[in-house]
Amino acid sequence: MPRVHVFARDHINTDEIIPARHLTTDIEAELAPYAMEDYDRDFAKRVQPGDIIVAGADFGCGSSREHAVWALRGAGVGAVIAPNFARIYYRNSINNGFLALECDGIVEAFQDGDEANLDLKGGTITNLRTGQTLTFVPVPQFALDVQKAGGWLEYMRAQVPAEADDSSSAQPHPGKENAHA
């Protein structure tokens, strides 16, 4: 089961998620050691693949940088759950196939190190220590599809062959009928 890392403060900004001094690469594995460094210097050493960050409101505010998502994903974080997110961070999460889940009362329901059961289909997270279950805002199917594909670009690349197959029986584009005549 994934462990929970609680960052209870509201307005944790992208500079705290990945400090600007480390924005010299876009390789997740190279960003990972610096994830949350200015907030918790040892976070990247403790986090395990699939672990969950529980955070306060407006997580990801500040500068628009995809590196904030890449650093957390590179460190092994499986999802961030907060009451709400800065819109640009939320969109960057979707575009990069990373789970950002909105859930009221999440910070009060968990302590650092708790284990959790995250049920995406059911829209719930359960604290295994206390048995408390909370419901989060359902993830739109589109966002789940993008996440499953690994990000927006990968999702779109997968759509191109499907669209090409659909268009093979379509009428030729006007003016293209005699292109090879």
Swiss-Prot record:
Enzyme class: lyase
Keywords (A to Z) from UniProt: Amino-acid biosynthesis, Branched-chain amino acid biosynthesis, Leucine biosynthesis, Lyase
Reaction catalysed by this enzyme: (2R,3S)-3-isopropylmalate = (2S)-2-isopropylmalate
InterPro entries per the UniProt record, alphabetical: Aconitase/3IPM_dehydase_swvl (IPR015928), AconitaseA/IPMdHydase_ssu_swvl (IPR000573), IPMI_Swivel (IPR033940), LeuD (IPR050075), LeuD_type2/HacB/DmdB (IPR011827)
Lipid metabolism listed as a keyword: no
Protein EC: 4.2.1.33
GO MF annotation, one: 3-isopropylmalate dehydratase activity
Pathway of action: Amino-acid biosynthesis; L-leucine biosynthesis; L-leucine from 3-methyl-2-oxobutanoate: step 2/4
Pfam families: Aconitase_C (PF00694)
Gene3D superfamilies for this protein: Aconitase, domain 4
GO biological process: L-leucine biosynthetic process
Task performed by this protein: Catalyzes the isomerization between 2-isopropylmalate and 3-isopropylmalate, via the formation of 2-isopropylmaleate.
PANTHER family: 3-ISOPROPYLMALATE DEHYDRATASE SMALL SUBUNIT 1, 3-ISOPROPYLMALATE DEHYDRATASE SMALL SUBUNIT 2-RELATED-RELATED
Subunit details: Heterodimer of LeuC and LeuD.
NCBIfam families: LEUD_arch
Assigned protein family: Belongs to the LeuD family. LeuD type 2 subfamily.
Record-given protein name: 3-isopropylmalate dehydratase small subunit
Species of origin: Deinococcus deserti (strain DSM 17065 / CIP 109153 / LMG 22923 / VCD115)
Lineage: Bacteria, Thermotogati, Deinococcota, Deinococci, Deinococcales
Gene this protein is translated from: leuD
